[in-house]
């Protein structure tokens, strides 16, 4: 039989419907069709995997060609390295010893006849790629530091502007420590505040020195180190727990300097007139809170509480906060009760160049004397004054009055 006629007859399309076969024949024919469909209709998974693997190898080979382009490494050597599973990333991360082992493996195990120039070309290309990556990383870190330093300078300029406009910004550090000097105060006032009352807290500035960032190829860091930041935060929490002033008061220097009445402060720090004005603003915010509470039918606060500080912050006066206002409330009390004595104290400490911490401690003495004249009722002294009755009496002031009263009773 002619093969061509046989093929044409075999593949001729028959338009007539096929006759019904017996059930057993139909089942066998169905199984045969499924087998044929499975063998010829579905793509082979192994072929697809081989195709993907070939594409991946081709991609890695192109990367190796780009790496060793100008270093005299032959194409057959690159192909063998791809077969061994090496990529550009693995080669760059290898040490010199590992590169020697790679060359030795190519020669001894895979029987690749490397030229003398190829051995040095492989190492030279990898060293050059390492230097290129390190240089790119160094430039990226320099740009990052420049951006951070520029942002820091912008923030400092903004803080300077806000400070000159009358906004007080919290700063946890101070140029001096909070130390009560008995030599400077005992000549004017007989009371000793450090007689077993509070430990002397010294705020060290060494926690804000610039450090270097480890792991960043030895680049110096202009920001504070993470270790110093953690230590500073721990020191703040410790001072907050050890504070004898109030339950939530933290002993730290605020951005104020001792100024005479009517004197304007220069630089970032504000004067004492500005500090006393903050207490006047708190009184106005208390009136606002009382007015709102009356409109809502709620209980009106009679003293400056957390609700007043939250209202001040919501109104845009974020520079008014509880720690600062509680820290200097007795100074404001002396200013309200005896402004002449307060002004004399300010002038004296300004002439001596004392910091605001020492001036703050000295403000306790006249208040203790006033409490003595009032039968040691410091609460009554505050309640008699219209501007002071809205403030809580500091715990430290109560303790000093009790201590002085005990000394007087033993005499």
From Swiss-Prot:
GO molecular function: DNA binding
Tissue-by-tissue expression: Expressed in vegetative buds and male cones but not in female cones, vascular tissue, roots or secondary needles.
Gene3D superfamilies per record: Protein LEAFY
Region (Disordered): 220-259
Family: Belongs to the FLO/LFY family.
Cell compartments where the protein resides: Nucleus
Protein name: Floricaula/leafy-like protein
Biased composition (Basic residues): 231-240
Chain residues forming the annotated DNA-binding region: 252-256, 321-328, 392-395
An annotated GO BP: regulation of DNA-templated transcription
Function: Probable transcription factor.
GO cellular component: nucleus
Site (Interaction with DNA): 299, 306, 310, 357
Basic and acidic residues biased stretches: 241-255
InterPro entries hit by this protein: FLO/LFY_C, FLO_LFY, Floricaula/leafy_C_sf, LFY_SAM
Keywords in alphabetical order: Activator, Developmental protein, DNA-binding, Nucleus, Transcription, Transcription regulation
């Amino acid at each position: 039989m002619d093969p061509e006629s046989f093929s044409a007859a075999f593949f001729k399309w028959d338009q007539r419907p096929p006759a019904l076969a017996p059930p057993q024949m139909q089942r066998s024919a169905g199984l045969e069709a499924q087998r044929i469909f499975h063998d010829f209709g579905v793509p082979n998974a192994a072929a697809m995997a081989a195709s993907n693997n070939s594409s991946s190898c081709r991609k890695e080979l192109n990367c190796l060609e780009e790496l060793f382009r100008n270093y005299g490494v032959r194409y057959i050597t690159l192909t063998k390295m791809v077969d061994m599973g090496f990529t550009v990333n693995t080669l760059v991360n290898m040490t010199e010893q590992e590169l020697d082992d790679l060359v030795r493996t190519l020669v001894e195990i895979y029987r690749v006849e490397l030229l003398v120039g190829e051995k040095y070309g492989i190492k030279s290309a990898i060293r050059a790629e390492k230097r290129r990556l390190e240089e790119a990383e160094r430039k990226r870190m320099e740009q990052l530091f420049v951006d951070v330093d520029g942002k820091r300078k912008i923030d400092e300029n903004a803080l300077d502007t806000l400070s000159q406009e009358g906004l007080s910004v919290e700063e946890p550090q101070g140029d001096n420590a909070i130390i009560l000097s008995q030599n400077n105060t005992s000549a004017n006032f007989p009371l000793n505040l450090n007689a077993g009352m509070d430990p002397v807290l010294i705020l060290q500035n060494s926690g804000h020195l610039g450090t270097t960032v480890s792991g960043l190829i030895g680049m110096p860091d202009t920001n504070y180190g993470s270790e110093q930041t953690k230590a500073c935060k721990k020191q703040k929490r410790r001072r907050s727990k050890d504070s004898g002033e109030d339950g939530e008061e933290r002993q730290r220097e605020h951005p104020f300097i001792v100024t005479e009445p009517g004197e304007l402060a220069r630089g970032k720090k504000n004067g004492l007139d500005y500090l006393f004005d903050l207490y006047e603003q708190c009184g106005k915010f208390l009136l606002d809170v009382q007015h709102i509470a009356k409109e809502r039918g709620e209980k009106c606060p009679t003293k400056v509480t957390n609700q007043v500080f939250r209202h001040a912050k919501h109104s845009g006066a974020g520079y008014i906060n509880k720690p600062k206002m509680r820290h200097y409330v007795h100074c404001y009390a002396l200013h309200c009760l005896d402004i002449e004595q307060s002004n004399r104290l300010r002038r004296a400490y300004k002439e001596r160049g004392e910091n605001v911490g020492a001036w703050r401690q000295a403000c306790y003495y006249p208040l203790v004397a006033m409490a003595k004249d009032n039968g040691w009722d410091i609460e009554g002294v505050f309640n008699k004054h219209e501007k002071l009755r809205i403030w809580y009496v500091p715990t430290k002031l109560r303790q000093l009055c009790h201590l002085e009263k005990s000394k007087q009773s033993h005499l």
